[in-house]
Amino acid sequence: MAKSRVLIVGGTGYLGRRMVKACLDQGHTTYVLHRQEVGVDIDKIQMLLSFKEQGAHLVEGSFNDHRSLVEAVKLVDVVICTISGVHIRSHQILLQLKLVEAIEEAGNVKRFLPSEFGMDPARMAHAMEPGRATFDEKMVVRKAIEDAKIPHTYASANCFAGYFLGGLCQFGKIIPSKESVILSGDGNVKGIYVDEYDIATYTIKTMDDPRTLNKTIYIRPPANILSQREVVEIWEKLIGKVLDKSSLSEEDFLALMKGLSHGHQAGLTHYYHVSYEGCLTNFEVEDGVDASKLYPQVNYTTVSEYLKRYL
């Protein structure tokens, strides 16, 4: 079977650049949307040119130009969007509604994978404000996709390793300390940590798979379902040293929101649901929607392997 042609929207972003690489690595004809809004951002322009050198095709388009989106979509079989939903960076989830309109008009897309890649928003109706907006907006996009009867796959990838493992699962830290760590409560709530390139690898595998059509797929590498304490213990073994540990209660953690910017408050509430509530592991996932069981051939990065880069 011929491999699908793919359009990546948001290809210069944190996850998007990895999605482009995984798409090329798996042999797909890959198009990357070159948005006019990039302007004179030299880093993004250079990244786009590097994609071209690796074999990707650049196609111009803009969320402010409906016709350009339609023409870009007509080039491919699959559209993957990775634009940011992170409040402290650039929160753009609802821009995807314009992409949905373009896909509906083009009429040729066999699969659309919108920008999800975190917690499953369908399970987060109880989420705290202001972070709840992220999940609500993703559900608005889902409804638009389903109302338009666009074939789709939603990918729930849980915790990006760089944001969580890098700081030993501490909010606001992305480099592991060799001296001390603050535990969230007792540190025993389990999370799921996934290398960002592995997220892309699994995602690309789902897009041509009839088993994943119109489903939510959960990326849950079994060896990476760990508590914060377990992550810290792995780091301690790597550095040959026991860290000084203190604990931050749920109440004290929530009190940190006072005086923070809206974006940081949103991020803090997401972290709360993961690290105190355990929202990623308080439900069972069926084999048919578990990416690690659908694609056992993927040699994913373990927590220990990921943390070695910080030594």
Swiss-Prot record:
The active site is at K138 (proton acceptor). It comes from Sinopodophyllum hexandrum. Combinatorially expression of Sinopodophyllum hexandrum (mayapple) genes of the podophyllotoxin pathway (e.g. DIR, PLR, SDH, CYP719A23, OMT3, CYP71CU1, OMT1, 2-ODD, CYP71BE54 and CYP82D61) in Nicotiana benthamiana (tobacco) results in the production of the chemotherapeutic compound etoposide. It catalyses: (-)-secoisolariciresinol + NADP(+) = (+)-lariciresinol + NADPH + H(+); (+)-lariciresinol + NADP(+) = (+)-pinoresinol + NADPH + H(+). This is Bifunctional pinoresinol-lariciresinol reductase. Reductase involved in lignan biosynthesis. Also involved in the biosynthesis of etoposide, a chemotherapeutic compound of the topoisomerase inhibitor family. Catalyzes the enantioselective sequential conversion of (+)-pinoresinol into (+)-lariciresinol and of (+)-lariciresinol into (-)-secoisolariciresinol. Abstracts the 4R-hydride from the NADPH cofactor during catalysis. Its EC number is 1.23.1.2, 1.23.1.1. Belongs to the NmrA-type oxidoreductase family. Isoflavone reductase subfamily. PANTHER family: NMRA-LIKE DOMAIN-CONTAINING PROTEIN (PTHR43349:SF47), PINORESINOL REDUCTASE-RELATED (PTHR43349). The gene is PLR. NADP(+) binds at G10, G11, T12, G13, Y14, L15, G16, R35, K44, R142. InterPro entries: NAD(P)-bd_dom_sf, NmrA-like, NmrA-type/Isoflavone_red_sf, PCBER-like. Substrate binds at H270. Induction: Transiently induced after wounding and by jasmonic acid (MeJA). After an exposition to UV-light, first transiently induced before fading out. Pathway: Aromatic compound metabolism; phenylpropanoid biosynthesis. Expressed in rhizomes, stems, and leaves. Transmembrane segments: none annotated. One of its GO terms (molecular function) is lariciresinol reductase activity.
